Each structure stands twice: as structure tokens, then as C-alpha cells.
């Protein structure tokens, strides 16, 4: 922990048109007007992890519940289970054996506040551990950030946001997923009213 290696981290975002062919393997048009078999991003990353078994690899899927998960993962629903890691199966388009190595970790991120999105079905859900990520206003990192800005008005704004979030959590029609996140207020080197006005004007609809 604490060491970043971009070669061992891959991040993608699912969407409604994302497919097994994009993720694992499939035929794609080539320059000659024909089709050729091409490997998807997860396939390539698994091979990379397999070639370096002494290192951990992390595959991050943003908006995981935006895609058709059963269609995207296909037969890999079995291989991503702990009990089947390292075991081989044949993929849909080839007789080549394929495996998801034990040193590869899949992290899926989803927005539970967007009720227009599909929830993860049980077949895939039971293959993941679920953790709720709450706004980080009370973390040591954000507290240090507040100390760096050292502005009483900013501190009062954050206190107000915490009160609003408490109200949101208690509202049965909303809940934790609708809380205002800390990222709106980050990455500012010094506090000024111009920044605050821009923040509120640009993000008032989402807030």
C-alpha cells in the first residue's frame, strides 16, 4: 500500500452499449473489409497479471451497473469467483484456455442514487463484497485540507453541508446515496468568494 504503479491498474467505464466483445474477445471489422478476432481490455489485463504473479493487479469498473453485466461477463461469471480463480475454461470465440489469475482484483463502482440504472443481479452480486463509500468530510485528509485553507467561512460552509447530509440521510425518499460529496470542495489552494460562487452556480442543479 502507498505505492502507485499505473502498469498494474486499469480503469474503464461501463455503458449500455458495452459488450462482451469489448470486454473479453470478439470479431471486429478490419481495414480490408473483413473481420478479425480482437482481444478486449479485460482479456489483455488478465494476461498481464498472469505474467507477473508476484504483483497485485487492480481492474476498476466505473458505473458497473450501467452495463448489461451478464452479457458483458459471459462465462467469466464463474471465473471471477474465488473458488475458480486460476482455473481454465474455453472462451466463446476460441478454443484457447483462459483464466482469471488470483492476483487480479476487480473493483466495481456504482451510483446507488441514480434509480434509472439497473441494480446488479444476484448472480453477479454474490461474487462481490459490497462497501458503502460515504462523503469524506470527517476524514483526516479532508480535515488537513481544511487546516490548509484556514478559513472560518469555509469551515462554516462544511458544517452546513454536514447538517444537510444528516437531513438527507433521515429522509426516507432519499438516503445515504443522495448525500453531498466532499469532492465538490476539494483541490482548492486558497479560499475565495469567486470560487465559492462558481461552485454553487455550476453545481446547483446536482446539489
Predicted stretch roles:
Residues 182, 202-207:
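Short, hydrophobic/amphipathic alpha-helical patches that form generic packing surfaces
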Residues 1-174, 191-194, 198, 202:
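AAA+ P-loop NTPase catalytic core and its hallmark functional loops
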Residues 174-184:
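The conserved phosphate-sensing helix
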Amino acid at each position: 500500500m502507498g505505492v502507485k504503479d499505473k502498469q498494474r491498474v486499469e480503469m474503464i467505464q461501463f455503458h449500455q452499449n458495452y459488450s462482451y466483445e469489448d470486454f473479453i474477445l470478439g470479431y471486429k471489422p478490419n481495414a480490408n473489409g473483413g473481420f478479425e478476432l480482437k482481444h478486449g481490455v479485460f482479456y489483455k489485463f488478465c494476461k498481464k497479471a498472469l505474467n507477473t504473479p508476484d504483483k497485485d493487479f487492480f481492474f476498476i469498473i466505473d458505473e458497473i451497473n450501467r452495463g448489461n453485466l451478464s452479457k458483458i461477463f459471459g462465462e467469466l461469471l464463474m471465473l471471477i469467483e474465488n473458488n475458480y480463480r486460476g482455473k481454465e475454461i474455453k472462451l466463446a470465440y476460441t478454443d484457447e484456455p483462459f483464466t482469471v489469475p488470483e492476483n487480479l482484483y476487480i473493483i466495481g463502482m456504482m451510483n446507488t442514487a441514480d434509480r434509472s440504472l439497473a441494480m446488479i443481479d444476484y448472480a453477479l452480486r454474490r461474487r462481490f463484497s459490497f462497501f458503502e463509500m460515504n462523503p469524506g468530510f470527517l476524514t483526516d485528509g479532508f480535515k488537513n485540507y481544511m487546516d490548509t485553507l484556514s478559513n472560518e467561512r469555509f469551515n462554516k460552509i462544511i458544517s452546513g453541508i454536514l447538517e444537510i447530509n444528516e437531513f438527507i440521510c433521515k429522509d426516507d425518499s432519499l438516503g445515504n446515496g443522495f448525500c453531498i460529496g466532499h469532492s465538490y470542495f476539494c483541490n482548492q489552494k486558497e479560499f475565495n468568494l469567486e470560487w465559492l460562487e462558481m461552485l454553487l452556480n455550476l453545481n446547483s442543479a446536482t446539489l
